[in-house]
Amino acid sequence: FVLKKNELTLKWERKASAGGLVTAVAPVVIQGNGIWIGWAGVHLEEGEKIPESDPNDKTPTAGLLSDRVIPVDFDPQIFDSYYNGCCNGTFWPLFHSMPDRAQFSADSWKSYCAVNKEFASKTVGALENLSRVDTDSGTPLV
């Protein structure tokens, strides 16, 4: 899901986002009482919470409880360079046997490294917090 501001209430609301990976992974996270670490699609201020899903939401991420979601925040330009530059411009063609379509950019690579460093930091922090509150917290799947 991504977050969108409701124009009437000015509160964040969850909106479904497309993606096969999310569709496949979300039910596993939910059934395993896991933690979802991801980009919410917007910048959240310190202390702003992820809202619960709408009770009528039937999308795969609807069952992710807000206290099990860890948002990762990025500068929009860095995220765009990471996602559209490195992931879609470089990795996607390479992983789909189209190396002639791959585009290589040092800036996109730097953005990719910065985004992954932030994801790693949030993941380690979440695992450390989980180990403090639940000594039998299982095995992390990344």
PLM features: what roles do these ranges have?
Residues 1-142:
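Catalytic cores of carbohydrate-active enzymes across secretory and cytosolic contexts
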